[in-house]
């Protein structure tokens, strides 16, 4: 049996919105790229280009260090 899967076209949100640089102070933007557990979602899932994925990782790590974002989930 052949397995059919629907693949949606992935696009880089940063190039679509013409964002030049990812900043750690944009917490609402960063939350879109973090899973429920607090992990950074990989580029193969989000469709982000490698250049922006590196900036995103650095920005998330800085925001975590400054307590703008949590390191893990809420542990409910």
Curated annotation (Swiss-Prot):
Ribosomal protein among keywords: yes
GO molecular function: small ribosomal subunit rRNA binding; structural constituent of ribosome
Functional note: Binds as a heterodimer with protein bS6 to the central domain of the 16S rRNA, where it helps stabilize the platform of the 30S subunit.
Subunit structure: Part of the 30S ribosomal subunit. Forms a tight heterodimer with protein bS6.
GO annotation, cellular component aspect: cytosolic small ribosomal subunit
Any GO BP annotation: translation
Recorded family membership: Belongs to the bacterial ribosomal protein bS18 family.
Keywords: Ribonucleoprotein, Ribosomal protein, RNA-binding, rRNA-binding
Identification of the protein by name: Small ribosomal subunit protein bS18
